[in-house]
Amino acid sequence: MDEFGVRNLRQAVASVGRDDLIQLCQELLRRPGVSGREGDVARFVAESMRSLGFDSVVIDSYGNVVGEIIFSAEGPRLLLTAQMDHVDAGDVAEWSKYPFGAFIEENRIYGRAASDQKGALASMMLAASLLKRDRSGALQGRLFVAGAVHQETFERVASKAIGDFADPDCVIVGEASGLLLERGQRGRAEIRVDIFGRMAHSSHPEFGVNAADVMVEFLSFLKSRFTPPRDEFLGEGILVLTNLFSSPSYN
């Protein structure tokens, strides 16, 4: 972008202001969006994108919202994406602040999904609208901003639909990074282990096989024998138990 384009962009940024970004973020936070129930958030995101001047806005069959700004028919395709969903807030009475209140205190916004990733989504939407105001002709290609669903539960399928639609040359994901540009991801493998015991009454455990005891032994064995790899650039791998389910029988 030449000097004229940079000057235009700075003027556009100055015209929006901090309050517009804060207000958009608060509106997102005030709309709960538990994974699989993101409809209210999605409708608001689509509405906002249209108001911000996106050239096209679609909500796909999964519920993802994808807005597009076209600078030219040819050129690179950039995708900015952040999730709209979050895990359940649980008992809201246990929170020190109402999780969907979007309160501001000491220059911080408090709310479920503020950093993961509604704050990023608000920033991306406004940033894209600012770029559209550039009239220098220096920007080429297409810019997509996507609000993704099911990130907490079904991300591989739902997010793939965004990628298939936008067909991007480059992607920026709104994961929290301490305002650092992170350019790699360790990847993830989900491993399910089923352990079957033999039922017995708790007063006579010697007649059965306690699957929970076997699971404890298995986890100890796994941690003692398997060390996650370390990459010079990406750092240490991790191994963590995330879910444990057992039979509903208590005796």
Please identify what each model-predicted range represents.
Residues D2-G90:
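N-terminal helical capping/dimerization or prosegment-like subdomains
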